[in-house]
């Protein structure tokens, strides 16, 4: 066992790009009708198959699982408000012998992935499911909040009680489970093709507003109530939604009657800019002029928060739109060029089944390294303290140990960038480099809070503790073949050249980590020492 002492130095970052850019790499995992959920009702089989799905997502460097927990007025978790969905046991309302959401949270966190609880907001259930659920259904408990729409029931956003009901549902979930986010789906009015009669509600509550404005205000009221409920319990839980893929008509491109703001009452841009949403995943299952200009429109309208467009992996299927893989590749490459906040893929089964080679391309070329999700606003506005740690080398393994609790991120220097290696919340992280030479690379560690906000980095190098200096650096046994010294920063960039003397003035250096290197008469250079100011 070889003990290596490291100096952990706080240093001001000179450029944000010195560390990997963060982005959402999300996947929708649909439990409704078992679309992405394991087949059969045996609990152990479900758990094993779910773990295999999560293993595949982890291997593709996915960092966020949008796990469907409220399906259609039924749940994938233990709720005192709504009944269990039948996909887990075969019988609607019957409790399974384990908690699927609790299990999924534990397994996602074990793999370093976030789990956002995906909740379908207004649609509740089909008529056949209503019959099976009986008095357990929200349709029977709160008939005043529900409207029949063809062969299903939909909650009426115009009824004031709808906002309170959904807010209470989200409050219960957040208080019981360690979810990383709440993700709202169908947080909108039905499309025009569905019959939805809210005329009586409009007459009672419209108060002189036109129908479109009134409907938009109703959905916004629900969003605001849910935001208050979630953030009052756990302000670090991320709130997101999946709006219709086009926000509004563009000056030179029509949405063809299908947009979020004007067609279905989703003013998602306002929700994001007011801070009621942390993330938007607009469902952009289009191509060409129906995709590219609308991506830019979302990004240009966002004044805060993150926009990570949702892309249709299912569109590759021959049974759907039968897109060539190149179409999706171009769309995803465009998101990087446009500096979007990441992406979300719909849906898991089409990805893990490698439809038209999409999984191989994603894991092998597009998401080759892990990254963190973007941070959200911390109302306290205080960053974590720069961490201190010890590190042990055992064979080809490096063991990072943090004496204080909390979340810590580990990075390795590659050129001028520090790339994300991994994260620990246990106080210990083990790294085995692919090449033994990387044992001697430069590392950085950063503490992180639940909001995703990181501390200033501490830089780690093998070679003994780095001394802290005030104004003067002393060099003992000055080499005779040295004509000068370089003073370099923590990234190896040369800051200045100084005379080869035994006493060097460093009083004007900013606090941080530095390296002193020789400049040989024959052109060579070697490290003399590390020091900090």
Feature-to-residue mapping (PLM):
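Active-site-adjacent "subsite" loops/lids of carbohydrate-active enzymes
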Residues: 22, 30, 34-47, 117, ...
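C-terminal tail/sorting-segment detector
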Residues: 462-467, 474-476, 511-533
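Pro/Thr/Ser/Gly-rich low-complexity, intrinsically disordered linker/stalk tracts
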Residues: 361-404, 451-463
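Polysaccharide-binding and catalytic clefts of secreted carbohydrate-active enzymes
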Residues: 62-63, 111, 140-270, 274-276
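Catalytic domains of carbohydrate-active enzymes, especially glycoside hydrolases
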Residues: 48-74, 176-179
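Beta-strand-rich modules
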Residues: 431-453
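Short, surface-exposed loop/turn motifs with a glycine/proline- and acidic-biased composition
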Residues: 436-442, 491-496, 500-522, 527
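Substrate-binding cleft of secreted/luminal carbohydrate-active enzymes
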Residues: 268-291, 305-378
């Amino acid at each position: 066992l070889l003990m290596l002492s490291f100096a952990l130095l706080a240093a001001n970052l000179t450029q944000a790009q010195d560390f990997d850019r963060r982005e959402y790499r999300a996947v929708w995992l649909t439990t409704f009708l078992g679309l992405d959920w394991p087949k059969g009702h045996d609990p152990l089989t479900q758990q094993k198959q779910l773990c295999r799905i999560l293993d595949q997502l982890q291997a593709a460097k996915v960092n966020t699982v949008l796990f469907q927990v409220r399906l259609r007025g039924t749940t994938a978790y233990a709720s005192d408000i709504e009944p269990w969905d039948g996909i887990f046991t075969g019988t609607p309302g019957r409790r399974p012998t384990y908690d699927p959401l609790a299990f999924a949270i534990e397994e996602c966190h074990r793999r370093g992935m976030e789990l956002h609880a995906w909740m379908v907001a207004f649609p509740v259930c089909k008529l056949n499911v209503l019959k099976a659920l009986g008095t357990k259904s929200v349709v029977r408990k709160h008939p005043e909040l529900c409207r029949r729409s063809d062969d299903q029931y939909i909650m009426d956003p115009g009824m004031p009680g709808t906002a309170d009901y959904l807010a209470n549902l989200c409050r219960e979930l957040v208080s019981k489970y360690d979810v990383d986010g709440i993700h709202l789906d169908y947080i909108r009015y039905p499309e025009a093709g569905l019959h939805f009669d809210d005329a009586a509600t409009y007459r009672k509550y419209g108060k002189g507003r036109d129908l479109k404005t009134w409907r938009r205000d109703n959905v916004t009221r629900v969003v605001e109530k849910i935001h208050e409920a979630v953030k009052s319990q756990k302000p670090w839980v991320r709130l997101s939604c999946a709006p219709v893929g086009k926000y509004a008509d563009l000056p030179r491109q029509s949405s063809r009657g299908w947009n979020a703001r004007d067609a279905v009452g989703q003013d998602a841009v306002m929700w994001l800019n007011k801070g009621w949403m942390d993330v938007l995943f607009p469902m952009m299952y289009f191509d060409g002029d129906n995709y590219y200009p609308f991506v830019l429109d979302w990004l240009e309208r966002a004044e805060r928060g993150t926009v990570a467009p949702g892309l249709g992996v299912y569109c590759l299927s021959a049974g759907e739109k039968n897109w060539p893989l190149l179409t999706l590749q171009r769309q995803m490459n465009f998101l990087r060029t446009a500096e979007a906040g990441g992406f979300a893929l719909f849906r898991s089964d089409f990805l893990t089944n490698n439809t038209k080679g999409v999984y191989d391309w994603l894991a092998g070329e597009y998401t080759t390294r892990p990254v963190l999700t973007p941070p959200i606003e911390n109302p306290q506005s205080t960053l974590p303290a720069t961490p201190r740690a010890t590190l042990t080398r055992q064979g080809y393994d490096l063991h990072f140990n943090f004496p204080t609790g909390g979340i810590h991120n580990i990075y390795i220097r590659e050129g001028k960038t520090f790339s994300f290696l991994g994260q620990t919340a246990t106080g210990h992280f083990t790294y085995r480099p692919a090449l033994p030479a990387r044992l001697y690379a430069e590392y950085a560690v950063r503490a992180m809070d639940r909001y995703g906000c990181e501390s200033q980095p501490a830089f780690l190098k093998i070679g003994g503790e780095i001394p802290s200096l005030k104004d003067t650096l002393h060099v003992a046994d000055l080499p005779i073949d040295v004509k000068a010294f370089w003073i370099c920063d923590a990234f190896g960039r040369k800051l200045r050249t100084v005379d080869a003397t035994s006493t060097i003035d460093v009083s004007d250096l900013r606090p941080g980590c530095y390296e002193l290197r020789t400049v040989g008469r024959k052109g060579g250079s070697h490290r003399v020492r590390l020091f900090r100011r």
